[in-house]
Amino acid sequence: MNNNEKFIIGLGNPGKEYIQNRHNIGFLLLENFSEKYDSKFTLKNKLKSWYSEFKINNFTYRLFMPNTFMNNSGNAVRAIVDWYKIDLDRLFIIVDDIDLPLGKIRFRKKGSSGGHNGIKDIINKLQTENFNRIKIGIGSPPVNERKKTLNTISHVLGNISSKESLTLDRVYKKLIESLIELNDKNEDYIISELNSFHREENL
């Protein structure tokens, strides 16, 4: 990271009916982030996203919530990357992950989609797997082999419970602090710290 800008894109689905869905955890993190620093989101049609920016310690933070649906997230990410001519090491994608326990964080600098349709579309549109993604665990749906697909959909599109919110609030706090601290000198340390973080162990 050689520039004093960080580009953070949270994935989710637009629309009031999706606001509190587990699948919208990327949006929820960025809303917490912008609120903490008194910044508002405005719609930028050319970027296919809602956009917020603010400065902390000489760094400019540019936050984006795509107004495409999750499965078309790559359209917004491609528009953002092209407009700002972003080096991908300064880009951070925030997503939910059903394969991680609730509250677990996993930071990866590259890799496959892991079955996440939003990440899959970004890989397709950018034509590379080499970009940062920060996964937040939402836990797995109840096991029911006969209705596995249905259970997964209902789980990710289900609303976050009040108990889950208590867990995720601590995760948001940790991630926001880490994204602010992150720089080219401490990157490996921050990534390791995030990957070892689990809400239950840090109460």
UniProtKB/Swiss-Prot annotation:
Reactions performed catalytically = an N-acyl-L-alpha-aminoacyl-tRNA + H2O = an N-acyl-L-amino acid + a tRNA + H(+)
Q: Which domain of life is it from?
A: Bacteria
What Pfam families does the entry give?
Answer: Pept_tRNA_hydro
Q: Where is this site: Stabilizes the basic form of H active site to accept a proton?
A: D96
Q: Tell me yes or no: is Glycoprotein among this UniProt entry's keywords.
A: no
> Per the record, where is site Discriminates between blocked and unblocked aminoacyl-tRNA?
N13
State the active site: H23
Q: What is this protein called?
A: Peptidyl-tRNA hydrolase
